Amino acid sequence: MIKSGLWNGETFVELRETETCASEGGAALMERVKGLIHSYHDFEAIGISTAGEVNTEDGSIFYANSNIPGYTGMPVKQIMEEEFCVPAAVENDVNAAALGELRSGTGTGCDDFLCLTYGTGVGGSIVMNGNVYPGASFSAGSFGGMVIHPEEKAGTDSLEGCYERCASTTGLVRRVKKVDGSLDNGKKIFAAKDRPEIKEQIDAWIDDICTGLVTLCCIFNPSRIILGGGIMAQEYVLSEVNRKVKAQIAPGLGIVEIVPAKLANTAGVMGTADLWLTDHLLTTGSLFANLA
């Protein structure tokens, strides 16, 4: 969904949603976004958070996977500024969410943390000294590409055995549907978690989540990890992740807090981007859109 709203200096008004239709490609997506923005009036800046790896220097899409065909290289900032004649800023959606959590969510008071979101895939962000670490090619935090099951890499699919394939909500659904094809989303799955065969699949999925998090703890030694995505609202998931990670990490790594995102679900997905972008653009009369 494309979620948009107008920041009036205190809150968001005129909240709207429209289908992304990502499979139609990047050019079609830009036309949908422009049409949505044209439905607003009297704004002085535009902020966009989007899937894909964003070159924050020029506001273009450095890389996007096949979920949005033709999106790689898209000059989003340039397109918006030329269309609307106002300044624009573009940021990766998870990075924007992490900065929103830093300012007004569960990252408050912690300048160094990791933020991961679990949904269709797994997105990640690294916050160091109060800023997102972009990496050499704006791709730092691509945790979904970590290989956690090398034994599954047999073909040309780059995601075989990777964290994103195994630990995402999509990965959970894929597992469970092999047992019961009617359980095709997270809500249905957790409504059936008392069934032993379903709980077994959920626990195996949580094990994969924890394998990735323990690896990240060894690399970054964070004091806090923030987990977002609708599936993390399940109390059982967060409780088990905390228990298993703390049991597996080396004592020398200290204690890591694993906490749910405060802002990164539903309207908060857009809000986290907005909270950051208001520091870079105008504080009032700014229009924001989250392209999910």
Task: State the predicted function of each range.
Residues 20-22, 69, 140-142:
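A short acidic/small-residue loop/turn micro-motif
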Residues 51:
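Conserved NAD(P)H cofactor-binding loop of Rossmann-fold oxidoreductase domains
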Residues 90-94:
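Short loop/edge segments at beta-strand edges and connector loops
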Residues 108-162:
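Glycine-rich phosphate-binding loop of actin/hexokinase-like ATP-binding domains
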